[in-house]
Amino acid sequence: MYLELVKKNSVILDKDGNKVKEVELPFIFSFPVRKDIIRRVFLAEFTHSLQPKGRDPMAGKRTSAESFGINLGMARVPRVKNSGEAALAPNTVGGRLTFPPSVDKKLVEEVNDKEKQLAVISALSATADKVFVKARGHVFKDSVSFPIVVTDDIVSLKTASEVEEFLEKIGVYDDVKRVKERIRIRAGKGKMRGRKYKESIGPLIIVHDSNSPIVKAARNIAGVDVVNAKDVSVIHLAPGAHSGRLTIYTETSIKILDERLSKRLVS
């Protein structure tokens, strides 16, 4: 089965939101959106962030308790000598767990390399479709065209206020406002464990240089993430396995993504 893909065109904007030129996009932005593959790969990659946990094999067993035996008119649970206090058994205070978690459990789910690359291509394609971006809940001006491609000089932005001003000029700052308004206190014990607030997902900026000033400038803006094109994955493009994240690309990052992923469309 062969797919006939048609290349899309995109407008390139400068820091002030003005149209600079129009370019032809690579085929990776024309691929059909496969939600099933995106979800499968997202869940597999998410397992890499899980921390193995287990219990001390001797937990609850550090006692000399033994059962007193039968025909005494009492339960046959192990009991501490000279006190008769039940111990060791799973149904006793301070006893062992019945089936404790084991560090040997395999937490990381593996996925085929081809499938992983296909998921990234599919997620990239969703970011180029206004319908998918809108359906995900992002807010932006009607004049915004997708995908959003900007000139490389935006990576030189040094302060958060400059980045916010840039987002306002290209018409996506309303999405940052949406995230700020929806920051809320988490339910449950996570509040005690350094996760007091829950924050929604906002715009993603894909750059070509991890050491550029914009990486630090944007990290304190609510919901905004900055990622190198070499490292971008389904985790960034489709958080929660929901495709269509509002994404901003630099001109060079498009070329890096094309070099990295176009071979998969040919093979």
UniProtKB/Swiss-Prot annotation:
Gene this chain is encoded by: rpl4
Protein name: Large ribosomal subunit protein uL4
Any single GO CC term annotated in Swiss-Prot or TrEMBL for this entry: ribosome
Coiled coil: none
Keyword Isomerase: no
GO molecular function: rRNA binding; structural constituent of ribosome
Family, similarity comment: Belongs to the universal ribosomal protein uL4 family.
NCBIfam families recorded: rpl4p_arch (TIGR03672)
Assembly mode: Part of the 50S ribosomal subunit.
Gene Ontology biological-process annotations: translation
Alphabetized UniProt keyword annotations: Ribonucleoprotein, Ribosomal protein, RNA-binding, rRNA-binding
UniProt keyword annotation of Nucleotide-binding present: no
Classification via Pfam families: Ribosomal_L4
Function text: One of the primary rRNA binding proteins, this protein initially binds near the 5'-end of the 23S rRNA. It is important during the early stages of 50S assembly. It makes multiple contacts with different domains of the 23S rRNA in the assembled 50S subunit and ribosome.
